[in-house]
Amino acid sequence: MDEFHRYGKEDSSWQQCFLYPLFFQEDLYAISHDHYLDGSSSSEPMEHLSSNDQFSFLTVKRLIGQIRQQNHSIVLFVNCDPNPLVDRKKSSYSESVLEGLTLVLEVPFSIRSKYSVEGMNEWKSFRSIHSIFPFLEDKFPHSNYVSDTRIPYSIHPEILVRTFRRWIGDAPSLHPLRSILYEYRNSSESLQRSIIVVPKVNTRFFLFLWNNYVYECESILVSLLKRSSHSRSLSHGSFPQRTHFHRKIKNIFLFSRRNSFQSIWSLKDPNIHYVRYGERSIIAIKGTHLLVKKYRYYLPIFRQCYFHLWNEPYRVCFHQLSKNCSSSLGYFLRVRMKPLLVKTKMLDELFIADLITDEFDPIVPIVPIIGLLSREKFCDISGRPISKLSWTSLTDDDILDRFDRIWRNLFHYYSGSFGRDGLYRIKYILSLSCAKTLACKHKSTIRVVRKELGPELFKKSFSKERELDSPPFSSKAAARSQRERIWHSDIPQINPLAHSWQKIQDLKIENLFDQ
């Protein structure tokens, strides 16, 4: 790859004209075949990987010819043969072709990403998901509108091919990609016109498709802001398997009235901040209602013209930060801007100034959390705990672990809020719901369950809570801990309750625009 980068720096035309011959390099398929064996050796028996099944590069070349002729006798994504030995051999060659195609396409993409990030002084990029918390504390006080947008992940195969065609001039190299994408769409259970590009499929091919698709989605946003600003900023490069990044745009000035985008900017100095995690992105803007309204209708149209697909209007929805809940990492957080008085004093000239600024003050939204718990059958609509009947078939350890995981995620996330009194009500609902679930399973009473398993209920969460609520050393440290917020680094873990919450909110927004 380093050798390709050096050649690409000297002459960038080679990857647009000579990609297709790389498909017939035996070294490429030797590497891809080794990667496939390494990934499947832990889950498949070793006798299937014996030396009797020799890997033939001639067979690989014939498979490539079948793809060119769109011969659907080979299946790259669905294994239909009941014979495991024949199926294993077929899958080995098919996956090697798929790995080889991915390796070839990664060469120009990595070069394009590497040499397109010049002038990063105007753009500050942080590729860690934990940078979202400094983003919330630093940028939300300077914003008044926030948009929580879900990136469209259902797209037609031909549009994906056209995104590659914009920066790869070698048309024959895209024929195998087109055939593979159409075959994957036809082999899926739901025969739709679109395919789903999500990073949850843990294969090199789908990770590459997702990174390239996100790169294209965000490059149009970057180019729009570049045209609307005097300052020079370049688009970001999303490298493979680096899907979490944080990007900030600042100091956007009003462009010339002769610019075609002058109708977008009705404020001289709008602050625009952007962050993405997984399939969702947050855009924070400080501007007038007219500016936000224009963004609301302009961004879907701009993306529609770029990707040639209809983008639902509810995917871009701005709401006022001071009146609504803000979504982050699947959870919802109510934000209150608290005025903070800062006094400055200059001793020499005896000058005293009082500065008033906004401070990020997150609040735990108790009512939405109770509404979500009632939807998930942990309590009724008034917040009275009930038993989780769907979990009574599980073991006691599984029930305790599931309740413990939900409480730990909620407590760790909202521990960054100053007022955590509402969390104790949530803890009461979950603990009593857990006790009722165990009592319903064993056909006993809550008193018996608490007597037998009382210390074990949320044992890990209680210990973590005591570490936060009872700081060591001195009373001064205890007082300081009450003024400071603590964001835990294990918040981004998978939480089914948070995903369910996000789906409910997306459905509400969709129904709102359908009316």
UniProtKB/Swiss-Prot annotation:
UniProt keywords, alphabetically: Chloroplast, mRNA processing, Plastid, RNA-binding, tRNA processing
GO MF term list: RNA binding
Gene expressing this chain: matK
UniProt similarity note: Belongs to the intron maturase 2 family. MatK subfamily.
Main location: plastid
Statement: the UniProt record of this protein carries the keyword Chloroplast: yes
HAMAP family per the UniProt record, alphabetical: MatK
Gene Ontology biological process terms from the UniProt entry: mRNA processing; RNA splicing; tRNA processing
Subcellular location: Plastid, Chloroplast
Annotated InterPro entries: Domain_X, Maturase_MatK, Maturase_MatK_N
Primary role: Usually encoded in the trnK tRNA gene intron. Probably assists in splicing its own and other chloroplast group II introns.
Record-given protein name: Maturase K
Gene Ontology cellular component list: chloroplast
One Pfam family from the record: Intron_maturas2
